[in-house]
Amino acid sequence: MNSSTVNRVTLVGYCGETPEMIYIKSTGNPVCNFRVATHKNYKNKEGVNFEATIWHKVSAWNNLAEYVAENVKKGSKLYIEGELSTSSYTTPQGVRKDSVSIQISELKVL
């Protein structure tokens, strides 16, 4: 096992929707899923400045999910630390889809 790897994400961005808390049927654990927007500035070939919005899927679990549900609203500026998590599923048409999200370990409303 290689212990010299890192899976860590830090975001400062804006909540794009009011988080909804759901409960996992098998465990009863709460989770809040929502999206956070960050922005990237760049210049095109002609030197014109543009701003691109990048959307990140994020999830908060258990006590952190309850905190998010009570304190985070659409438009809230957030500081988030967490790790990337991947999952995959197969569509009814038999196509495999992969999804990446950020599992939040620390969140502050700024």
What are these regions (language model features)?
Residues M1-L110:
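Single-stranded nucleic acid-binding surfaces, predominantly the OB-fold ssDNA-binding core
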